[in-house]
């Protein structure tokens, strides 16, 4: 069994692609011929490792090479203010793949990372094998829940007023069972958030510059790659009806819903998630 560490898999790749011109941090693990790229969400202090540390070993053990990309403006990647957001994050991923000589990979994205994965499928379909999106994908507003949701309000409030108190408020509704969040995880997230204050202010500026998240709902019928949509029934950040919209719109999609699950399916139900997605990729 693998024992991948953050430090042992860490590398930096200089990327010049579109509006991206800087150093992108990547955790690169495994040496399989098939590659899986994982994209993190948008919460303050988010990183590829913090989002997917419960998943990377299982995928490497199954024979995949795994890339956890810190999107520009997050964690160890270079700071940026971007108007296109998803477009810039996809450009960064393309640049990383090009530098590493990877022509095609499966894309897995959580929340904002789901929108990044979808943007990869829109802009660079030839580089995308299968697509997996959890609690995200950027297909407009909910028809069942007032927007922005309580979770997104807390997230944006944390960016504007970063503190341990506000972080705990957000994390309390981030997962179904907040008692499962360890002090080590919470403290690590706080330290990561406060280590790069420029990322926090830049994210707020990017929100203003972009005018909100893009809506790819009209493009769903063109995304023909096999797709698995995964949602938490109890997600208080991105409502489940958006997953249903994606299911209805994409030609080759399936939806799996975890009960007793919030916005972090790959962490809250890691073992089941790993097996579900590995089975999907192996078909």
UniProtKB/Swiss-Prot annotation:
Q: Where is the AB hydrolase-1 domain?
A: 35-269
What are the recorded GO MF terms, alphabetically? Answer: 2-hydroxy-6-oxonona-2,4,7-trienedioate hydrolase activity; 2-hydroxy-6-oxonona-2,4-dienedioate hydrolase activity; monoacylglycerol lipase activity; protein homodimerization activity
Q: Which reaction does it catalyse?
A: (2Z,4E)-2-hydroxy-6-oxonona-2,4-dienedioate + H2O = (2Z)-2-hydroxypenta-2,4-dienoate + succinate + H(+); (2Z,4E,7E)-2-hydroxy-6-oxonona-2,4,7-trienedioate + H2O = (2Z)-2-hydroxypenta-2,4-dienoate + fumarate + H(+)
GO CC field? cytoplasm; membrane
Keywords, ordered alphabetically: Aromatic hydrocarbons catabolism, Hydrolase
> Where in the chain is the site Catalytic role in ketonization of the dienol substrate (substrate destabilization)?
189
Does the record carry Hydrolase as a key word? yes
Name the enzyme's class.
Answer: hydrolase
Q: In which pathway does it act?
A: Aromatic compound metabolism; 3-phenylpropanoate degradation
Role played: Catalyzes the cleavage of the C5-C6 bond of 2-hydroxy-6-oxononadienedioate and 2-hydroxy-6-oxononatrienedioate, a dienol ring fission product of the bacterial meta-cleavage pathway for degradation of phenylpropionic acid.
Please name the HAMAP family in this protein's record. Answer: MhpC
Protein known as: 2-hydroxy-6-oxononadienedioate/2-hydroxy-6-oxononatrienedioate hydrolase
């Amino acid at each position: 069994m693998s024992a991948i560490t953050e430090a042992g898999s860490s590398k930096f790749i200089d990327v010049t692609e579109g509006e991206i011109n800087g150093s992108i941090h990547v955790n690169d693990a495994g040496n399989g011929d098939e590659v899986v790229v994982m994209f993190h969400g948008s919460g303050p202090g988010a990183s590829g490792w913090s989002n997917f540390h419960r998943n990377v070993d299982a995928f490497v053990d199954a024979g995949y090479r795994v890339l956890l990309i810190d999107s520009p403006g997050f964690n160890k990647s270079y700071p940026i203010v971007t108007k296109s957001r998803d477009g810039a994050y996809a450009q960064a991923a393309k640049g990383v793949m090009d530098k590493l000589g990877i022509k095609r990979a499966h894309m897995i994205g959580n929340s904002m990372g789901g929108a990044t994965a979808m943007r990869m499928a829109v802009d660079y379909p030839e580089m995308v094998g299968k697509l997996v999106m959890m609690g995200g994908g950027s297909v407009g507003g909910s028809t069942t829940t007032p927007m922005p949701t309580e979770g997104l309000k807390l997230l944006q409030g944390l960016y504007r007023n970063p503190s341990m108190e506000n972080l705990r408020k957000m994390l309390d509704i981030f997962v179904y069972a907040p008692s499962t969040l360890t002090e080590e995880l919470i403290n690590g997230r706080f330290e990561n958030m406060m280590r790069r204050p420029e990322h926090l202010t830049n994210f707020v500026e990017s929100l203003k510059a972009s005018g909100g998240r893009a809506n790819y709902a009209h493009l769903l019928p063109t995304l023909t790659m096999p797709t698995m949509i995964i949602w938490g029934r109890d997600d208080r950040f991105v409502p489940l009806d958006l997953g249903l919209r994606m299911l209805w719109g994409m030609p080759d999609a399936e939806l799996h819903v975890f009960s007793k699950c919030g916005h972090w399916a790959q962490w809250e139900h890691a073992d089941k998630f790993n097996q579900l997605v590995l089975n999907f990729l192996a078909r």
